[in-house]
Regions:
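Ubiquitin-like/PB1-type beta-grasp interaction modules and other compact soluble beta-rich domains
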Residues: 1-169
């Protein structure tokens, strides 16, 4: 038997209007109190509601800025904001950051420095790196190696001090 855990999810902006649940007045988030299977990530939750990770600006879990790969725990409060609301959070202090080393090979150097150390919110996915460097539309033209292993899933959850190498195919 799979254990279910209760969580609270708030959808803001146009995300709240896409849900089939109760509609709120403008400016008020749509809050859902639901039960989910243990060990799901925020990304799993987004998929269940038909929301793509690239539609999201910011995710907060219990008030802490987080990535889509953050594992949801019993009683978590999750706030999900759309891209259009991104400017509201320009000066967030990133609590619980992870650091990754990214190396761009060959002609991909045009998308950033040859090598960079990047801080990301805990639970960030490979997709967040691709979006950050404008590579999400080139996913099928690049090879991504994380810690020496090829990774083909954009929703791969990054860990602290992962080494990411990006090659052109």
């Amino acid at each position: 038997m799979v254990n279910k855990i209760p969580i609270s999810v708030k959808f803001y902006g146009e995300l709240r209007d896409r849900l089939p649940y109760k509609k709120m007045k403008a400016g008020i988030p749509n809050t859902l109190k639901i039960e989910i299977n243990e060990f799901k990530t925020v990304l799993d939750l987004l998929k269940e509601f038909g929301i793509a990770e690239n539609e999201i600006s910011h995710i907060f879990v219990n008030g802490v800025y987080s990535g889509a790969g953050k594992i949801i725990k019993d009683g978590d409060r999750i706030g999900i904001f759309p891209k259009r609301m991104g400017l509201m959070f320009m000066e967030i202090t990133k609590i619980n950051s992870i650091y990754t080393k990214i190396t761009f090979h060959e002609e991909l150097k045009e998308f950033g420095l040859k090598e960079a150390i990047v801080d990301l919110p805990e639970g960030s996915t490979l997709n967040s790196i691709l979006n950050k460097y404008g590579l999400s539309n080139k996913r099928h033209q690049i090879e991504i190696i994380v810690n020496g292993k090829p990774i083909h899933e954009s929703d791969y959850i990054l860990k602290d001090w992962d080494n990411i190498a990006i090659f052109s195919l």
